[in-house]
């Protein structure tokens, strides 16, 4: 095998030169004689996508690629590395993909409690496939929308959930949608070249082979095929994606099937909305009084004591007792209260008032007051009326 390799290289060079001279605007593919023979081992040198060159011809050695050695532990169709002159233009269509990027969530996902949480990153092969489909033009967007529809509109993992049902988009090795020996990359490259982007043809072909290998690896997890793929094919993954009993205090809206979860009062306390805590006049108990509480009426004991109306006999006995002793004793007060049918407090207050009147009538208070009264500067002497005193 090592001695026969230079001959396919020379044949490939001549075939590429003839194809470039005949059709400069088309896409030329060359197959080695080993691929059409009986020893078709499916190696990497079977199909090599080459980007078309403009009107001026390029050197014949530039588009040539050396065949890679076959490893039995690799997938049947690993992605061939792009040439050096195609690696730089392959990253140019990404700004266009960012401008026409569609939203990857719906309104039912916003209501789920785990919306916005960081998810695990998809495989790098799927990221390359997504970038290639985004740069391929309108066809890439159609395939992306079709993948979301086939995945049951579950956009939490827009790339990860597409892998089990990738047979509807990309041909897996065990599917019946076409021969896996290079016709699928050729079709993808032709579609990209018709769209007017020849630089993305090789990248799209390589990404298609990588996505097909990833779909073949993830095929045993979904036995329903590509039509029923997505998150609905694997209930285990769906359960881990949206745990139903992860946090009962947060899972108020949304469950595994998207319906509302009804929580009773025994399971969870009443949760007030956010606006309740921003206003005072609400229905919560701690909002404060809306009306002023009425003042408690004072009891009759706290009211002012009514004026006591003494009889003539009572006033005569009190004045006689005051003449005998201006300060009545407790024992004498109790005896007088029983004789006159009065309270002890009434007798005590009458004696206090009588002493205050006499003190005010005499005007003898202190030395300073006497000195001022002698100079005529302090004269507060009052005349008492006997009738008023007797009535009291």
UniProtKB/Swiss-Prot annotation:
The entry's DNA-binding region: 303-362
Region entry Disordered, spans: 1-100, 132-164, 219-251, 282-306
One Gene Ontology molecular-function label: RNA polymerase II cis-regulatory region sequence-specific DNA binding
Signal peptide (residue range): none
An annotated GO cellular component: chromatin
Biased composition (Low complexity): 14-36, 85-100
InterPro entries linked: Engrailed_Homeobox_TFs (IPR050720), HD (IPR001356), HD_engrailed (IPR000747), HD_metazoa (IPR020479), Homeobox-engrailed_C-terminal (IPR019549), Homeobox-engrailed_CS (IPR019737), Homeobox_CS (IPR017970), Homeodomain-like_sf (IPR009057)
PANTHER family for the chain: HOMEOBOX PROTEIN ENGRAILED, HOMEOBOX PROTEIN ENGRAILED-1
Disease (UniProt): ENDOVE syndrome, limb-only type: An autosomal recessive disorder characterized by severe shortening and deformation of the legs and feet, 3/4 syndactyly of the hands, and toenails partially displaced to plantar surface. Radiographs show normal femora but severely shortened tibiae, triangular fibulae and malformed or absent bones in the feet. In addition, genitourinary anomalies have been observed.
Family that this chain belongs to: Belongs to the engrailed homeobox family.
UniProt name for this protein: Homeobox protein engrailed-1
Gene source species: Homo sapiens
Lineage, broadest ranks: Eukaryota, Metazoa, Chordata, Craniata, Vertebrata
């Amino acid at each position: 095998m090592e001695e026969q390799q230079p001959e396919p290289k020379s044949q490939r060079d001549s075939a590429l030169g003839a194809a470039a001279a005949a059709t400069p605007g088309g896409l030329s593919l060359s197959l080695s004689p080993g691929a059409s023979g009986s020893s078709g081992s499916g190696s990497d040198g079977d199909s090599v996508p080459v980007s078309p060159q403009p009107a001026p011809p390029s050197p014949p050695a530039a588009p040539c690629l050396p065949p890679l050695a076959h490893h039995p532990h690799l997938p049947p169709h690993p992605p061939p590395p792009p040439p050096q002159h195609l690696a730089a233009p392959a990253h140019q269509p990404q700004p266009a993909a960012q401008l026409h990027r569609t939203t990857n969530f719906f309104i039912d996902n916003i209501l789920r409690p785990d919306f916005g949480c960081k998810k695990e990153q998809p495989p790098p092969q799927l990221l390359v496939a997504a970038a290639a489909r985004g740069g391929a033009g309108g066809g890439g967007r159609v395939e992306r929308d079709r993948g979301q529809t086939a995945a049951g509109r579950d956009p939490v993992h827009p790339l990860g959930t597409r892998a089990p049902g990738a047979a509807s988009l990309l041909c897996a090795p065990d599917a019946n949608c076409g021969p896996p020996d290079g016709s699928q990359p050729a079709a993808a490259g032709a579609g990209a070249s018709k769209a007017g982007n020849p630089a993305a043809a090789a990248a799209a072909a390589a990404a298609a082979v990588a996505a097909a290998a990833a779909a073949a690896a993830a095929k045993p997890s979904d036995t329903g095929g590509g039509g029923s793929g997505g998150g609905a094919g694997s209930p285990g993954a769906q359960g881990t994606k949206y745990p139903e009993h992860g946090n009962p205090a947060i899972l108020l809206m949304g469950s595994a099937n998207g319906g509302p979860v009804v929580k009773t009062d025994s399971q969870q306390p009443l949760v007030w909305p956010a606006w309740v805590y921003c206003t005072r006049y609400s229905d919560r108990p701690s909002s404060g009084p809306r009306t002023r509480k009425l003042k408690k009426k004072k009891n009759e004991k706290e009211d002012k004591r009514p004026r006591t109306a003494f009889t003539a006999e009572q006033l005569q006995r009190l004045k006689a007792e005051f003449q005998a002793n201006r300060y009545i004793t407790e024992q004498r007060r109790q005896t007088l209260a029983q004789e006159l049918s009065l309270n002890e407090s009434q007798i005590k207050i009458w004696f206090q008032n009588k002493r205050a009147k006499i003190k005010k009538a005499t005007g003898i208070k202190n030395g300073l007051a006497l000195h001022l009264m002698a100079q005529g500067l302090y004269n507060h002497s009052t005349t008492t009326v006997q009738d008023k005193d007797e009535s009291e």
